[in-house]
Swiss-Prot record:
Gene: ALDH3B1
Modified residues annotated as Cysteine methyl ester in this record: C465
Listed name of the protein: Aldehyde dehydrogenase family 3 member B1
Entry's localization field: Cell membrane
Reactions this protein catalyses: an aldehyde + NAD(+) + H2O = a carboxylate + NADH + 2 H(+); a long-chain fatty aldehyde + NAD(+) + H2O = a long-chain fatty acid + NADH + 2 H(+); a medium-chain fatty aldehyde + NAD(+) + H2O = a medium-chain fatty acid + NADH + 2 H(+); octanal + NAD(+) + H2O = octanoate + NADH + 2 H(+)
Family: Belongs to the aldehyde dehydrogenase family.
Record organism: Bos taurus (Bovine)
Length: 468
C-alpha cells in the first residue's frame, strides 16, 4: 500500500481548484508561518538543543530569526512579486501587451536536512507558499526532535488541504520520490542529490539542489592574523562545524601559518574557554555515525590545536591540523565538523590553482588587506558564493541568491529568489483580433520587400517604450 498516495492526491486536487493562487490565501499562509515561530519559540529552541546542543544564541540567529526575516520580506513584497512583469517590445508587437506572468508550479516537494532543520525547512517553504504552490515537506529524520515539532505542530498553522509533512528515512524517501511532483527542492550532500535528480528526471521534474563541498579559505600574508583567526574560528565552529558554507580548509604560506595557529588558539580559548566541552556555546555532532567519521579524520596531518573527542557526549574539540597533504582523507570530503586543516601554498597563484583543480565549492573566502588580492581570487575562481575578509555573512543578505554551482548544487533561493525559484515564468503576448491587413505581410507568397519590412519589424529594440 502506498503511504503517500492519499496525501498527494489531496494536495494536487487543492491546487487544481485554484485555492492557493489568490494573494489573500498566500498572505494567510505566510502569517501562519510567522505565528508558528512566535508561539513555539521555546519549543523550537528546546528541540534544537536536544538535536544539536544548539545554544539559544545560535538557534535565534541561524534558525528562528533568519526564518522570520524571510517571512517578513515575503509578506511586505508579495503583491509586488506577483505582478505581471512588462517587457520591452519590437515594432511588430507595439500594439500588443507583452509580459511575464509568475505562476505556481503546482505540487512541490521540499527535502530538508538535519544541520539547520528549522531554517532549511522554512526558508524554501516561504518561497513555495508565497509563489502559490501546494507543498509536501519531508524533514530529516536524523534531527528527530525538530522533525517532531515540524510534523505535529506546524500543520496546525497552515491550510492542511494544501500543505503536509511526511516522515521517514531513506527507504520512505525513495518511495516518495517515485511520485510525480511539479518541483523538487533538496538540501543535502551531493551523493543523495544525484539520487534525487535521477528520480526527478524520470518525470522531467525541475529541481533545485542545495549541496555542499569543500569551501576554501585563502589567507594572504598581508593581513592581521588575529582578526582572520577570530572570524575563521567562529565560522568553522558555529553549529559544531556542521554548516555547508563553513570554511573547510585554509590555504596560506608557511610563514602565515606560524602566525595563524597561535591566533586560532587564542580565539578558540576566548570563545569556548580552556575546556570547550563545558562551553554552552559549542554544539555537538548530530549522531554516532558522523562522530566516528570525524574522529577518523583526526589522524590526518598533525594536530596542533584540540584533537580531543568524547564518544558518549558526541563531542569533537575545535581542532586545527597542519602538515596536511592534498591526498589525505580530510581533503577528500566535506568535513562537516569543527576540524580545520591548513594546507601550505607558496603564492596566490598556487592557491588559485589548488582551488581550481577541485570541484566548485558552495562558498569561497579570501582574507587580505589588499583589495586587489581579494578581487583576483574572486575573478579567477568559481563558487556558489564568495565573501572577502569574513565568513558566511553573505547568507544574511536576502538580496543575494544562495546556491551552488557544479557539484555544489544548482538553482538558488532566499528573498525574492525563493519566490522566483518556485514560480514558472510564463511568457505572454496578448494581441488584438483585428489589423489583419497589417499582419498579412507574414503570409505567402513572400516577396523581398515583405521580408525586409518583416525583419525590420521583428528587430530587437533596446527601448522599452510602448504605445499602450
Amino acid at each position: 500500500m502506498d503511504p503517500f498516495a492519499d496525501t498527494l492526491q489531496r494536495l494536487r486536487e487543492a491546487f487544481v481548484s485554484g485555492r492557493t493562487r489568490p494573494a489573500e490565501f498566500r498572505d494567510a499562509q505566510l502569517k501562519g508561518l510567522s505565528r508558528f515561530l512566535r508561539e513555539n519559540k521555546q519549543l523550537l529552541q528546546e528541540a534544537l538543543a536536544q538535536d544539536l546542543h544548539k545554544s539559544a544564541f545560535e538557534a535565534e540567529v541561524s534558525e528562528i530569526s533568519i526564518s522570520q526575516n524571510e517571512i517578513n520580506l515575503a509578506l511586505r513584497n508579495l503583491r509586488t512579486w506577483m505582478k505581471d512583469e512588462k517587457v520591452s517590445k519590437n515594432l511588430a508587437t507595439q500594439l500588443d501587451s507583452a509580459f511575464i506572468r509568475k505562476e505556481p508550479f503546482g505540487l512541490v516537494l521540499i527535502l530538508s536536512p538535519w544541520n539547520y532543520p528549522l531554517n532549511l525547512s522554512l526558508g524554501p517553504l516561504v518561497g513555495a507558499l508565497a509563489a502559490g504552490n501546494c507543498v509536501v515537506l519531508k524533514p530529516s529524520e536524523i534531527s528527530k526532535n525538530t522533525e517532531k515539532v515540524l510534523a505535529e505542530v506546524l500543520p496546525r498553522y497552515l491550510d492542511q488541504s494544501c500543505f503536509a509533512v511526511v516522515l521517514g528515512g531513506p527507504q520512505e524517501t525513495g518511495r516518495l520520490l517515485e511520485h510525480k511532483f511539479d518541483y523538487i527542492f533538496f538540501t543535502g550532500n551531493p551523493q543523495v542529490g544525484k539520487i534525487v535528480m535521477t528520480a526527478a528526471a524520470k518525470h522531467l521534474t525541475p529541481v533545485t539542489l542545495e549541496l555542499g563541498g569543500k569551501n576554501p579559505c585563502y589567507v594572504d600574508d598581508n593581513c592581521d592574523p588575529q582578526t582572520v583567526a577570530n572570524r575563521v574560528a567562529f565560522f568553522r565552529c558555529f553549529n559544531a562545524g556542521q554548516t555547508c558554507v563553513a570554511p573547510d580548509y585554509v590555504l596560506c604560506s608557511p610563514e602565515m601559518q606560524a602566525q595563524l595557529v597561535p591566533a586560532l588558539q587564542s580565539a578558540i580559548t576566548r570563545f569556548y574557554g580552556d575546556d570547550p566541552q563545558s562551553s554552552p556555546n559549542l554544539g555537538r555532532i548530530i549522531s554516532q555515525k558522523h562522530f566516528q567519521r570525524l574522529r577518523g579524520l583526526l589522524s590526518c596531518g598533525r594536530v596542533v590545536i584540540g584533537g580531543q573527542s568524547d564518544e558518549c557526549d558526541l563531542y569533537i574539540a575545535p581542532t586545527v591540523l597542519v602538515d596536511v597533504q592534498e591526498t589525505d582523507p580530510v581533503m577528500q570530503e566535506e568535513i562537516f565538523g569543527p576540524i580545520l586543516p591548513i594546507v601550505n601554498v607558496r603564492s596566490l597563484g598556487q592557491a588559485i590553482d589548488f582551488i581550481n583543480r577541485r570541484e566548485k565549492p558552495l562558498a569561497l573566502y579570501a582574507f587580505s588587506n589588499s583589495s586587489q588580492v581579494v578581487k583576483r581570487v574572486l575573478a579567477q575562481t568559481s563558487s556558489g558564493g564568495f565573501c572577502g575578509n569574513d565568513g558566511f555573512m553573505h547568507l544574511t543578505l536576502a538580496s543575494l541568491p544562495f546556491g551552488g554551482v557544479g557539484s555544489s548544487g544548482m538553482g538558488n533561493y532566499h528573498g525574492k529568489f525563493s519566490f522566483d525559484t518556485f514560480s514558472h515564468h510564463r511568457a505572454c503576448l496578448l494581441r488584438r483580433p483585428g489589423l489583419e491587413k497589417i499582419y498579412a505581410i507574414r503570409y505567402p507568397p513572400h516577396t523581398p520587400r515583405n521580408l525586409r519590412v518583416l525583419l525590420m519589424a521583428m528587430e530587437t529594440r533596446s527601448c522599452s517604450c510602448t504605445l499602450l
